[in-house]
């Protein structure tokens, strides 16, 4: 404040000085004199036409008042003239004036005033000093020309945003963020328990899982100012700009508190300190230090919540992750089976689907995909349909779109010789048959020899449920699966090819992980080896030396080689035993180019899968399984044996939903229900996502016409299930048009068409939920908005289609949410033509042949 006052006073003084200088400069007494040449003035003196004369010695000029007017430069009636003369001619001019017949003359010897002399010296100094102070002040604040100012964008109500209803497949993350919204809306409930709002929230997870979407949903739901900025916006070429932008950002936030700041890709500025190689000054460290101080330093940060997103939490500085800065760290992982179904249903809104399109089957085939991948699959399917002039998205379009996302587009123009095509058919057949003959690996869902992306073919497995834990036999079965292609080449042609390079790479990763990470090798033991000292540019040490001796490294290499050799032997023996099946499979592949599960079941109907034998010699000698003792049964297994309904596990997610619903009803009864932000245009609420408030709820016995009450709000049934007292009719608030704070009741009466008006608030009406002709219930993802008279869609060629009808999908006994997710070995695609994995692939251990390793 003092600096601002000094600057104001200095500016006023400078303006006054400038005005005085200009006044003294332009207030001259020679305005009425016409300036003429010196010769004209001398001629008037010689002619005696001068009445008065004045010599200004300092300015070296002479002013003459004439007796008779003259004409100067076509100007008539000039009576006063002024002329300049050189300094050395001053005596001659004086003699001329003295000799002329003038009435009077005078000599004016002027001296510069003290004020003018001081102005000529002080004014430039004041201007220079003022400019320096201006630039220095701008450097401390926003920087020169705004270089150091914050680039954060504040979202306003007019900007299109998302809501929690637009987020699917991340229910736990939504619930964690919903708590922040509740705290901002109703802090008294939390403050009564002494709770404080989290000061920082870090969203981390793989790319494409919806971290930024969650932040946009918070912006649409929070109801407070929301600032968004990228981590790279803090990094500039000028020293100190990053720290200045951090200060300016938090200054704006504090002025508008309570508010939320979202920093996307915070790893650009939040990497661990001490990672410089040359020992010099690191501008990023200065920015990070300022960020740490602003998040939890000596100053107050009341009412400012910092959200951040990154897919590299391992490189962040430990001081940034401690409680008090990021109190809550929320993982946003790839969705499970149920989450994929919800995401596909969200992105299926507005897309017409053919009757054979099955969203649930697509969700099972896309294990390991992120939400962005799933959205891309449906978009590719729509583009394929538009390319062929179709009006509905078919199952073939979904399958082709999945293959395009996984392995790339088809290379239809590639010329392949007959011999290479035959080698590819046997190579992929070796993978398929090796997996089919083992119990410890999923059956192959699809095998093809069509060139796609950088692969010449691939075999894909599809799991029934999401798995997160693998035993030794299951991992070894994947090694056998990977070695099947090379074994087929050796068995049939007698020589290997380069097509198995990606298979060898994937198998080596699995085998090395079994030995060095999972402790499955008796020779090495249960010790984690192979941990490098770290990346020298990540702040976690440098050098890259292994943390074990050369003798241990040799033992590890020996064990890895043993696993690969044994898997090679097992796959070779399987193919040699079922050589006839391999020939029939290769023949069918050469004919149809693509085979699916029904075709493979018909070819391999007489193959009995075997269990993997003992992997390591005498592996069960030291720690054998106790005989005649079985593990205990889970409550679900016991309930199924008794023919009872499986018990429902306690869920904090469901309990918090029930609490929010109960709180919503209380506020609704009091007429204090806050207005919920509308969902973004064109996006319907996701299944399983947090439901918004759309006015007074319908009666408890109301249901969609024809649905027998199936579509009642799930939140209405949860309180009693989660141990909360159910609301009795006597406790229910009276239903009235004004019970929600003056808003109209959308559930008042059905419309003339029979469709309840309240369903419009949820994104779809009765006509979308029910088939009016049959009364059958539709899945939202499989509903076409318009029913075309002739359905045209993308279809695969006849020779690529299955000769056998698809069998109904087997429902799993356990719900997909019962399984836990634990990262295992990332698998590689099984391709038969390239030594490199497919571009844009995913780490997916449970879907080994799905070309996403």
From Swiss-Prot:
The chain crosses the membrane at residues 6-26, 114-134. Residues 619-632, 639-648, 796-813 have a biased composition (Basic and acidic residues). Zn(2+) binds at residues 427, 431, 503. Residues 1-5, 135-853 are cytoplasmic. One of its GO terms (cellular component) is plasma membrane. Its EC number is 3.4.24.-. It is a multi-pass membrane protein. One of its GO terms (biological process) is protein catabolic process. The active site is at residue 428. Binds 1 zinc ion per subunit. Gene3D superfamilies: 1.10.8.60, P-loop containing nucleotide triphosphate hydrolases, Peptidase M41. Residues 27-113 are extracellular. Residues 619-853 are annotated as: Disordered. GO terms for molecular function: ATP binding; ATP hydrolysis activity; ATP-dependent peptidase activity; metalloendopeptidase activity; zinc ion binding. Its cofactor is Zn(2+). ATP binds at residues 205-212. Keywords: ATP-binding, Cell membrane, Hydrolase, Membrane, Metal-binding, Metalloprotease, Nucleotide-binding, Protease, Transmembrane, Transmembrane helix, Zinc. Acts as a processive, ATP-dependent zinc metallopeptidase for both cytoplasmic and membrane proteins. Plays a role in the quality control of integral membrane proteins. In the central section; belongs to the AAA ATPase family. In the C-terminal section; belongs to the peptidase M41 family. PANTHER family: ATP-DEPENDENT ZINC METALLOPROTEASE YME1L1, METALLOPROTEASE M41 FTSH. This is ATP-dependent zinc metalloprotease FtsH. It comes from Corynebacterium glutamicum (strain ATCC 13032 / DSM 20300 / JCM 1318 / BCRC 11384 / CCUG 27702 / LMG 3730 / NBRC 12168 / NCIMB 10025 / NRRL B-2784 / 534). The gene is ftsH.
């Amino acid at each position: 404040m003092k600096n601002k006052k000094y600057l104001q006073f200095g500016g006023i003084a400078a303006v006054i000085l400038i005005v005085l200088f200009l006044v003294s400069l332009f207030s001259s007494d020679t305005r009425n004199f016409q300036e003429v040449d010196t010769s004209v003035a001398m001629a008037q003196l010689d002619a005696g036409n001068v009445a008065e004369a004045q010599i200004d010695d300092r300015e070296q000029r002479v002013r003459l008042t004439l007796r008779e007017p003259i004409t100067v430069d076509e100007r008539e009636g000039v009576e006063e003239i002024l002329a300049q003369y050189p300094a050395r001619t001053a005596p001659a001019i004086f003699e001329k004036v003295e000799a002329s017949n003038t009435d009077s003359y005078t000599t004016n010897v002027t001296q510069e005033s003290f004020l003018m002399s001081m102005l000529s010296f002080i004014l430039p100094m004041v201007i220079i000093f003022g400019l320096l102070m201006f630039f220095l002040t701008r450097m401390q604040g926003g920087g020169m020309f705004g270089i150091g100012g914050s680039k954060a964008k504040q979202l306003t109500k007019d900007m299109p945003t998302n809501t929690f209803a637009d987020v699917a497949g991340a229910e736990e993350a939504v619930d964690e963020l919903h708590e922040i919204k509740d705290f901002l809306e109703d802090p008294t409930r939390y403050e009564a328990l002494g709770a404080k709002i989290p000061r920082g929230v870090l969203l981390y997870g793989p790319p494409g899982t919806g971290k930024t979407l969650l932040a946009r949903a918070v912006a649409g739901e929070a109801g407070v100012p929301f600032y968004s900025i990228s981590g790279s916006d803090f990094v500039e070429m000028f020293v100190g700009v990053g720290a200045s932008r951090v200060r300016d950002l938090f200054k704006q936030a504090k002025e508008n508190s309570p508010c939320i700041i979202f920093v996307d890709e915070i790893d650009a500025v939040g990497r661990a300190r001490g990672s410089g190689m040359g020992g010099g000054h690191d501008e990023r460290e200065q920015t990070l230090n300022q960020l740490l101080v602003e998040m939890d330093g000596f100053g107050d940060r009341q009412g400012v919540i910092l959200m951040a997103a990154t897919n590299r939490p391992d490189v962040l500085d430990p001081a940034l992750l401690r409680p008090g800065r990021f109190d809550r760290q929320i993982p946003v992982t790839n969705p499970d089976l149920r989450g994929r179904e919800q995401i596909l249903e969200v992105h299926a809104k507005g897309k017409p689907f053919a009757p054979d399109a099955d969203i649930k089957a697509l969700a099972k085939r896309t294990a390991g995909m992120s939400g962005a991948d799933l959205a891309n699959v449906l978009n590719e399917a729509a583009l394929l349909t538009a390319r062929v002039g179709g009006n509905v998205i078919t199952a073939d379009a979904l399958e082709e779109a999945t293959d395009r996302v996984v392995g790339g587009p088809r290379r239809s123009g590639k010329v392949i010789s007959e011999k290479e095509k035959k080698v590819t058919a046997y190579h992929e057949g070796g993978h398929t048959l090796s997996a089919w003959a083992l119990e410890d690996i999923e059956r192959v869902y699809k095998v093809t020899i069509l060139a796609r992306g950088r692969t010449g073919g691939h075999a894909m497995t599809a799991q029934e449920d999401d798995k997160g834990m693998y035993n030794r036999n299951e991992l070894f079965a994947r090694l056998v699966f990977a070695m099947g292609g090379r074994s087929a080449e050796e068995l049939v042609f007698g020589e290997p090819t380069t097509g198995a390079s990606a298979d060898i790479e994937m198998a080596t990763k699995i085998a090395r992980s079994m030995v060095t990470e999972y402790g499955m090798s008796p020779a090495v033991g249960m010790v984690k080896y192979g941990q490098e000292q770290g990346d020298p540019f990540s702040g976690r040490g440098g050098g890259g030396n292994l943390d074990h001796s050369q003798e241990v490294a040799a033992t590890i290499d020996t064990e890895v080689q043993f696993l690969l050799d044994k898997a090679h032997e097992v796959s070779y023996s399987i193919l040699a035993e079922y050589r006839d099946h391999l020939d029939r499979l290769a023949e069918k592949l050469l004919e149809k180019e693509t085979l699916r599960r029904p075709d493979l079941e018909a070819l391999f109907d007489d193959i009995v899968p075997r269990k993997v034998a003992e992997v390591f010699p005498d592996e069960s000698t030291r720690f054998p399984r106790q005989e005649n003792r079985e593990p205990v049964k889970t409550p679900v297994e016991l309930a199924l044996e008794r023919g009872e309904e499986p018990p429902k596990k306690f869920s904090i997610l469901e309990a918090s939903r029930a609490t929010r619903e109960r709180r919503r009803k209380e506020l609704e009864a009091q007429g204090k229900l806050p207005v919920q932000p509308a969902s973004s245009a064109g996006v319907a609420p996701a299944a399983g996502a947090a439901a918004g408030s759309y006015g007074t709820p319908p009666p408890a016995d109301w249901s969609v016409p024809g649905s027998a009450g199936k579509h009642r709000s799930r939140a209405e049934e949860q309180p009693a299930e989660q141990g909360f007292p159910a609301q009795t009719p006597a406790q229910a608030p009276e239903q009235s048009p004004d019970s929600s704070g003056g808003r109209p009741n959308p559930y008042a009466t059905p419309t003339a068409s029979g469709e309840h008006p309240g369903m419009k608030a949820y994104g779809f009406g009765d006509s979308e939920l029910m088939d009016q002709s049959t009364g059958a219930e539709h899945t939202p993802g499989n509903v076409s908005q318009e029913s075309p008279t002739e359905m045209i869609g993308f279809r695969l060629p006849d020779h690529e289609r299955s000769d056998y009808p698809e069998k109904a999908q087997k429902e799993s006994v356990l719900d997909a949410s019962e399984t836990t997710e634990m990262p295992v070995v990332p698998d590689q695609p099984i391709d038969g033509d390239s030594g490199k994995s497919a571009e844009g692939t995913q780490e997916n251990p449970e879907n080994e042949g799905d070309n996403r390793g």
